[in-house]
Amino acid sequence: MSIRRVMHVDLDAFFVSVEQAVRPEFKDKPVIVGGKPERRGVVAAASYEARKFGIHSGMPLITAKHLCPQAIFIEGNHQLYREYSEKFMLILSDFSPFLEPMGLDEAYLEVTGFESLHGSIAQMASKIRRRITAELGINASIGIANSKVAAKIATEQAKPNGQCEVPAGEEASFLAPLDIAVMPGIGKKTEQHLKSLGIDTLGKLAALPASFLKSCLGTYAPYLSNAAMGIDNRPVEMPSEAKSISRETTFETDTRNQTFLEAKLSYLSEKITATLRKRGKQTRVVQIKIRFADFTTLTRQKHLGQPASGNREIFQTALSLMNGILDSDRQAVRLLGVGISDFCGPEKQLEIDPAKARLEKLDASLDKIRQKYGFSSVQTGRTYRLKDMF
């Protein structure tokens, strides 16, 4: 019987690495993805050169600017990142069909028994890293172990641009000297609480009596106790199809501008309906989400009379929901989001309304153009107005 081997693959500083791949002039420079520092926002990603100044994800952009005035600040290009992510996952799927994506830039691979195909699992990891670098122009780090949790921690030890394999049976000794902060699931508050008790390494965590650990951490204690020894029986799971699609955006400044809000809502609606049609689905439910300047958040949803997948149908429904909220509360809006759910397959119809048929053809044409040239290559009149509003 083969010894279980799990691989965790993580693209190093993903957003920034993609930007450096397409813009070589950014190589070896402190680059920060997140937007202009004078705008409200946080660091989405920082290059390793920027991290040397203490900059990290989630930090306010203005703070990052103070720490590293010479840093290059750029807007994120999420369409580009998704394209790179798709290519990344395709590369991984060439090595194992048992693939579990974890966001855009990392994934688990079940590689038990694959040694005969590649010489060894370590050689397999080297091949994966070489292909990623050759085809995407970015680096990856890989951890290999007998479980998902140990593999992920091994990846962190391998960064940047390296690989780390934990020999079978040596998981506990590998993890024992590491700081408890490296354990997935231990947040800042839990870390501080444990360290206040003198528990600062995974070895000390693993040695705690189960009853004591449960009194500290509650029902999460058994998992952490096992994980600290590298014991984690969770399988690598193929992703199931998402049951909803949503998009939201936080504005740089709070706004009451109705024209701007409608244009942004139209853009968000076009994004989610394009994804819906790409899946060959229709939706029965449309939801709107609005967060006001005082952080009050309201949501509304509507069940459609007939399943739909068209830009116009989804947008008009979302617009009606948005206006229903704004008519009763005219505070400035901080965040706007739209979502769809309760999917079904396309309905077969013997007769189609000519006007609806024309709109479906228009949506299909827009989809083809955008798939080839990018989402922003063609825009509707309403979303085009956004160009003049920044």
Swiss-Prot record:
The keyword Transmembrane helix does not apply. CDD domains: PolY_Pol_IV_kappa. Keywords: Cytoplasm, DNA damage, DNA repair, DNA replication, DNA-binding, DNA-directed DNA polymerase, Magnesium, Metal-binding, Mutator protein, Nucleotidyltransferase, Transferase. Its main location: cytoplasm. PROSITE patterns: UMUC. It catalyses: DNA(n) + a 2'-deoxyribonucleoside 5'-triphosphate = DNA(n+1) + diphosphate. Its cofactor is Mg(2+). GO terms for molecular function: damaged DNA binding; DNA-directed DNA polymerase activity; magnesium ion binding. InterPro entries: DNA/RNA_pol_sf, DNA_pol_Y-fam_lit_finger_sf, DNA_pol_Y-fam_little_finger, DNA_polymerase-Y, DNApol_IV, PolY_HhH_motif, Rev_trsase/Diguanyl_cyclase, UmuC. Binds 2 magnesium ions per subunit. It is found in: Cytoplasm. Signal peptide: none annotated. Transmembrane segments: none annotated. Its EC number is 2.7.7.7. It is an enzyme of class 2 (transferase). Residues 6-187 form the UmuC domain. The active site is at E106. One of its GO terms (cellular component) is cytosol. One of its GO terms (biological process) is DNA-templated DNA replication. The keyword Magnesium applies. Mg(2+) binds at D10, D105. Monomer. NCBIfam families: PRK02406.1. Belongs to the DNA polymerase type-Y family. Poorly processive, error-prone DNA polymerase involved in untargeted mutagenesis. Copies undamaged DNA at stalled replication forks, which arise in vivo from mismatched or misaligned primer ends. These misaligned primers can be extended by PolIV. Exhibits no 3'-5' exonuclease (proofreading) activity. May be involved in translesional synthesis, in conjunction with the beta clamp from PolIII. This is DNA polymerase IV. It comes from Dehalococcoides mccartyi (strain ATCC BAA-2100 / JCM 16839 / KCTC 5957 / BAV1). The gene is dinB.
